[in-house]
Amino acid sequence: KQLASKMAESLLCLAADKQFNACGVCHSCQIMQAGNHPDHLTIRSEEAGKSIKIDQIRALKEKQSLTPSVANWKTVVIESADLMTNSAANSLLKLLEEPQNNTILILTTNAVHRLPVTIRSRCQQMHLSTPDYSMTLKWLDSQGVATDADQLRKISSLTLDAPFAIVNALETNEWQSYQQIQQDFDQLIQQQANPVQLA
């Protein structure tokens, strides 16, 4: 999400350097940092873990019909795009098939396989590798994420050490459900549980 935001900021910057870094001081950068850039839109689920709805994509399409007013580009970041409902994804597909001029759409997801194939086939994909566990720990510490080491190790194994997935798991407590499923599955394999009771 942070990378997507930085990419959008660089695209909208009026004085980006040769390495494509936003200057941080031009008018476009300042209003982007203030969170009210007229040429940028961030779409995310309205509640943690909930779906991105078709009304949000309709609002995006309405906004994208306008020409840029400050920068040379219009940017859209859709966070956790895999949370789109089917109708929202179908609505977005039409925009991807006929993109507006000078418009960049950036979709982020921790689960690209959950995106419809029709969406994936119309996007240029960039896969970010997961950092090693020690780097993840340092980053979590810098973000002020506090939890005991044993709990963190369990969550980390369930989320494949993905830092943002760890934070999301802690915020939503979903990891406890996954841990229970893992324990039930282990008991089934070891024939220590009745499948009917677990169901």
Language-model-derived ranges and their functions:
Residues 1-80, 104:
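P-loop/Walker A NTP-binding region and its immediately flanking N-terminal helices
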Residues 55, 87-91, 118:
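Generic recognition of short, well-ordered alpha-helical segments
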Residues 62, 94, 117, 121:
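Conserved adenine-binding aromatic site and its adjacent loop/helix in ATP-hydrolyzing domains
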Residues 79-85, 90-97, 113:
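Catalytic acidic motif of RecA-like/P-loop NTPases
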Residues 65, 90-107:
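Conserved catalytic/switch belt of AAA+ P-loop NTPases
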Residues 53-57, 85-86, 196:
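A conditional alpha-helix N-cap/helix-loop micro-motif detector
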